[in-house]
């Protein structure tokens, strides 16, 4: 926030953007097997989306002794809440900015800078969980 206040004080242009579902833009590496176990209503929803999932439904007994339907799916993209997702998103973000000629600030990895036509351009990012 202090950066935005300082930039406004200096008369710099400021723009804000949001990346909806940011973590979903990053892919899990091929050597990682992240398996998601879906049960109950989620299996019904998945089968409604694609009937082929019906062939992959398995039945298990839960801790209460009740038989429940389960669907195991391999996660291909980073999922919000997975430990590695934040890292994968940051890696994608920083690599993309580097390819565009921005330099990641070594003291604050959430800031990237680039000089274009003698003007400094700064990208600052943060995670908003609201």
Predicted regions and their residues:
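Long, low-complexity, charge-biased intrinsically disordered regions
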Residues: 1-130
